[in-house]
Amino acid sequence: MVFAGFQRRLGRRLFFAAPFALAAGAAAAQGADIKFKRSTLVIETGGRELKFDVDMATNDIERSHGLMFRKSLGPYEGMLFDFYQEQPVSFWMKNTLIPLDMIFIAADGTIRHIHSNAVPLSTDTIPSQFPVRGVLEINGGSAKLLGLKPGDKVKHAIFGNA
């Protein structure tokens, strides 16, 4: 009975694999329960100050979850990722349901690079192009609409200028 032996081997494999599958599912579910701290930042551009309410992603779990599974963002809302020191970073849009602009910010709060309209659900990597301290994600197309550009300043406590 080759089939019976196969069934036993398959049953053992499933028995040993089940805890890992459950753990992976629990980790994904845990991400849905993350309570991000809220903060306010200001972007200085073209003689204006634009105020944003942001969720803070300050640890590996928060940064890896980011805006995944969100269905919407308000017009002046976003997420600020803090990497604590300047470094090259890359993002992707896996499990992210809305287009985003990614604003890459130096340690002094200067916008270094803007990636516009990142494609929802894409697994293509989006590099910072420069070492950065933080990344601000806002609604796709907002950076252009608001006239944001490299060289503009972001004021927030993590940049020491708020």
Can you say where each PLM-predicted feature lies in the sequence?
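Compact, glycine-rich, soluble single-domain proteins
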Residues: Q30-A162
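N-terminal secretory signal peptides
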Residues: M1-L10, L14, A18-A24
